[in-house]
Amino acid sequence: KLACRFPDFIDYVESVCNEFRELYQNIKGTTPYCIKRVAVLNSWGKMRAWGAHMVHHAIYQKQNYSYAGVIEALSGAPFDVSFISFDDIRRDSGLLKNIDVIINAGDGDTAHTGGDVWEDEVVSSATRQFVYEGGGLIGIGEPAGHQYQGHYIQLANVFGIEKETGFTLNYDKYNWEAAGGHFITEDCTKEIDFGEGKKNMYALEGATILVQKEKEVQMAVNEFGKGRSVYISGLPYSFENTRILYRSILWSTH
């Protein structure tokens, strides 16, 4: 009934559908070339594929747009994207052998990043092993964020970053210098837009800071065993941020 009041909208939908019919007719079931296999890891997996960060018909939310851009960027990229849950890893951690890069994005202690699921040694050890043996890990916001056993970022040694929650104020922190240039940021022509970003993030020894603002890390990279990780405080959708994510995936899988 609502759509009938907007005939131009109906006509446009028809034209778009016809475009897709033509595409399907021409590709004849061919799988497009994908350069890497990327898995978005959260509590829902396939249940909320492509919609994990969508709230109320994708209406803009200040708390959400810094993460929704990640899914938007992946949707048009030359990657084989899948969505896996923590329960999937519990059932069969071997599935990670068919993945090149894991992305964990969102605020800490939420279903997006896992919360107390990281207390489960099966999940945490499988993820660490994946990276140590050569996999890539990209964290956006507060990946694996949950206060437990002296850490807030439960994969702190993998990402090379930690969040100051008051428990490490008396720790000396010396790693604040940002690197001059990096493969990931080569396409950037202006200051990187981190959206809301994150406060109180600091780098651990050995990590390479790409961007920091007032001694708060916004982007960093780290090597863990044979693998690599990338940390980004937020990534709202834009052309340049799409390139950042694209190059982050390539760099993390080297």
Task: For the regions a language model picked out, list residue spans one by one.
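Hydrophobic targeting/anchoring helices
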Residues: 1-69, 167-170, 210-212, 231-234, ...
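Catalytic beta-strand/loop cores that center a nucleophilic Ser/Cys/Thr
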Residues: 50, 164-228, 233-243, 254
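A short, well-structured beta->alpha microelement
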Residues: 73-93
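Short amphipathic alpha-helix with an adjacent loop that forms part of the alpha/beta core around
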Residues: 90-97, 119
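Short, well-ordered alpha-helix to beta-strand connector turns
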Residues: 98-100, 206-207
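Structural motif
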Residues: 100-107, 138, 229-231
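A glycine-rich, often tryptophan-bearing local segment used as a flexible ligand/cofactor-contacting loop or short
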Residues: 109, 114-190, 241
